[in-house]
């Protein structure tokens, strides 16, 4: 029988852990952790995602703020906003909600965020740390969420053959690097891959992060261990006459062909938010490392 990997349930467990750590940090060091989200433009979907992040932050006792900017803001002005936040000692985590308008260079924006406050893990410094296997950088939230789901439900990842579909800088590449850190054998597939099903059918685990509605079907699976669906698309439901969220995989056609599967919604999405807040806590600890480390040393005497 197929097990549904409940991302909402696991995310709530992680949020409780983060909440407890936040309380301990505040009680012991009087540190109130704060996340700032920069939203450029009036994308309705982006606003929904941002409001959800703020609501989750509030629920666990983390301060948060949304900075809304005009869609046609000059790139240099956006960079200036980031500079101010980098210098603000009350801010511990900074993210710029994607997508950005086409006139803004996203890579330049990621690089401008202080790597210690880069809780999306997209600054080149953090990406570099991830790829060399260092443990002191911030890792992209979706990649962390996927690994946590797999470790919670599947447990041992060592030696597993994982096919990652998608080579984006946001999910595909960092997730592949993190899987390698867990001693997986990783195959990366993309739009130029010939005979995708040949790769997916022989994998232990398939992870798709493409954003193409229901493009994976029963022909792509054959008794696989797990399928993690990162993709999110809106489609029109002919039965309900309403828009609904679906993933990259056709859930009903796939679910009986794998042992573990994530739903959309309710799978990877909640885990991404949980790890955004966990990363913000980690960022605060990195920023205040000297204070925390010195205090720990006192207790060793």
From Swiss-Prot:
Any GO molecular function: methylenetetrahydrofolate dehydrogenase (NADP+) activity
UniProtKB keywords: Amino-acid biosynthesis, Histidine biosynthesis, Hydrolase, Methionine biosynthesis, Multifunctional enzyme, NADP, One-carbon metabolism, Oxidoreductase, Purine biosynthesis
Highest rank taxon of the organism: Bacteria
Pathway: One-carbon metabolism; tetrahydrofolate interconversion
GO CC term (a single one): cytosol
Swiss-Prot/TrEMBL catalytic activity: (6R)-5,10-methylene-5,6,7,8-tetrahydrofolate + NADP(+) = (6R)-5,10-methenyltetrahydrofolate + NADPH; (6R)-5,10-methenyltetrahydrofolate + H2O = (6R)-10-formyltetrahydrofolate + H(+)
PROSITE patterns named among the record's database cross-references: THF_DHG_CYH_1, THF_DHG_CYH_2
GO BP terms: L-histidine biosynthetic process; methionine biosynthetic process; purine nucleotide biosynthetic process; tetrahydrofolate interconversion
Cross-referenced Pfam families: THF_DHG_CYH, THF_DHG_CYH_C
Assembly description: Homodimer.
Function: Catalyzes the oxidation of 5,10-methylenetetrahydrofolate to 5,10-methenyltetrahydrofolate and then the hydrolysis of 5,10-methenyltetrahydrofolate to 10-formyltetrahydrofolate.
Similarity annotation: Belongs to the tetrahydrofolate dehydrogenase/cyclohydrolase family.
Record-given protein name: Bifunctional protein FolD
């Amino acid at each position: 029988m197929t097990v549904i990997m409940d991302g909402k349930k696991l995310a709530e467990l992680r949020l409780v852990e983060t909440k407890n750590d936040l309380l301990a940090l505040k009680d012991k060091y009087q540190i109130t952790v704060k996340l700032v989200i920069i939203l450029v433009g009036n994308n309705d979907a982006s606003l929904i995602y941002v409001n959800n992040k703020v609501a989750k932050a509030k629920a666990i006792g983390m301060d948060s703020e949304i900075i809304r900017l005009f869609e046609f803001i000059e790139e240099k002005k956006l960079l200036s906003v980031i500079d101010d936040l980098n210098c603000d000692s009350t801010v511990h985590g900074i993210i710029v909600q994607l997508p950005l308008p086409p006139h803004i260079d996203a890579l330049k924006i990621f690089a401008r965020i202080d790597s210690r406050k880069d809780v999306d893990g997209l600054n080149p410094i953090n990406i570099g740390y991830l790829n060399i296997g260092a443990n002191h950088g911030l890792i992209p939230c979706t990649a962390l969420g996927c690994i946590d789901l797999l470790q919670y439900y599947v447990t041992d990842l060592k030696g597993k053959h994982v096919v990652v579909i998608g080579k984006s800088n946001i999910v595909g590449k960092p997730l592949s690097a993190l899987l390698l850190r867990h001693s997986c054998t990783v195959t990366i597939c993309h739009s130029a891959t010939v005979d995708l099903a040949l790769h997916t059918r022989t994998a232990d685990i398939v992870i798709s992060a493409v954003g193409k509605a229901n493009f994976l079907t029963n022909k792509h699976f054959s008794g696989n261990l797990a399928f993690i669906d990162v993709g999110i698309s809106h489609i029109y439901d002919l039965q309900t006459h309403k828009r609904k969220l679906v993933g990259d995989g056709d859930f009903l056609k796939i679910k009986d062909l794998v042992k573990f599967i994530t739903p959309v919604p309710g799978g990877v999405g909640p885990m991404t938010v949980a790890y955004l807040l966990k990363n913000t806590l980690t960022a605060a600890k990195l920023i205040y490392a000297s204070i925390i480390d010195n205090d720990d040393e006192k207790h060793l005497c």
